[in-house]
């Protein structure tokens, strides 16, 4: 039945998630309050939740001190249970320490990409996540598969081995390299493509939803496609959803999203160097 399908085929995180944006002050510090308000807004608009400090949130460019400040305030958000925390760090030690802060505030779900810059193989990646889980056995990790950013692409076999070793901790994958969502089948494991254009096809294949940058804009449309799929309604919004995604993909997604929002609210005009906002 549908209940069995959702809970045992689709996985633990069955949702439309936005990779939420970070709001930057004129002096290039993080505006913690407005960053949280933005995440709450896109949840109000239709997302089930938001990933904080993913690549869209400029995670690799924001200081650890500012991240900790945001975690403390985020722990009082009305949507506290709807957030996945991105670490956005190369250092294993700093990743573990940042997770310690988040865990002390009762955050449990984390989006973690393997380190960038260095060449390594599946066994090395398994060791990296093993060290994290040994330090935080109570955490739930969504793997971040994005070869374009970190230089490593998860294989089906690597994900299967991680889930086999850590079925309670490795709960899903954000697939932005798109080599997994059509080929990976693991019970009680969430596969979340990184694009709205993969949402409907992914759901048809048993995927759990999406985590995407452009859900900062498409939250209502993406939620409608998701809900209509499970309500067995005709898909009236999917083409428009894909069109919006395709329009943003012509540009750097972070620059495009900040340019889009800054047209109506000047707080979005700042991004951290070396990024820049789109011109007119």
Each PLM stretch: what is its role?
Residues 146-248:
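Catalytic alpha/beta core domains of metabolic enzymes, predominantly
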Residues 221-229, 269-280:
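Short alpha-helical "patches" and their helix-cap loops
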Residues 11-151, 159:
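Active-site beta->alpha loop and helix N-cap motifs at the rims of alpha/beta catalytic domains
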Residues 1-9:
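Short, Lys/Arg-enriched N-terminal segments with co-localized hydrophobic residues
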Residues 203-204, 240-276:
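Conserved short secondary-structure transition element at the edge of the structured enzyme core
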Residues 29-36, 64, 68, 92, ...:
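Electropositive phosphate-/nucleotide-binding environments in soluble metabolic enzymes
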């Amino acid at each position: 039945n549908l209940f069995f399908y959702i809970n045992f085929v689709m996985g633990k995180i069955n949702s439309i998630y936005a990779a939420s944006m970070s709001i930057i002050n004129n002096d290039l510090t993080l505006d913690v309050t407005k960053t949280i308000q933005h995440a709450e807004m896109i949840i109000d608009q239709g997302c089930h939740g938001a990933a904080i400090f993913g690549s869209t949130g400029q995670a690799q460019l924001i200081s650890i001190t500012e991240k900790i400040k945001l975690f403390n305030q985020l722990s009082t958000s009305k949507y506290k249970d709807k957030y996945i925390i991105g670490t956005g760090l190369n250092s294993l030690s700093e990743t573990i320490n940042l997770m310690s802060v988040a865990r002390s505030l009762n955050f449990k779900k984390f989006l973690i990409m393997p380190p960038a810059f260095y060449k390594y193989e599946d066994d090395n990646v398994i060791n990296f996540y093993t060290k994290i889980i040994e330090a935080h056995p109570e955490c739930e990790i969504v793997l971040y598969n994005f070869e374009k950013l970190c230089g490593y692409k998860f294989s089906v076999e690597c994900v299967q081995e991680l889930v086999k070793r850590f079925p309670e901790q490795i709960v899903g994958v954000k697939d932005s390299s798109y080599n997994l969502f059509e080929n990976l089948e693991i019970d009680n494991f969430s596969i979340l493509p990184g694009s709205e254009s993969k949402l409907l096809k992914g759901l048809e294949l048993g995927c759990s939803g999406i985590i995407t940058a452009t859900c900062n804009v498409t939250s209502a449309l993406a939620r409608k496609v998701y809900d209509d799929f499970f309500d067995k309604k005709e898909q009236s919004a999917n083409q428009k959803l894909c069109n919006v995604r395709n329009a943003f993909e012509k540009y750097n997604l972070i620059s495009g999203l900040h340019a889009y929002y800054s047209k109506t609210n000047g707080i979005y005009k700042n991004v951290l160097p070396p990024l820049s906002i789109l011109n007119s």
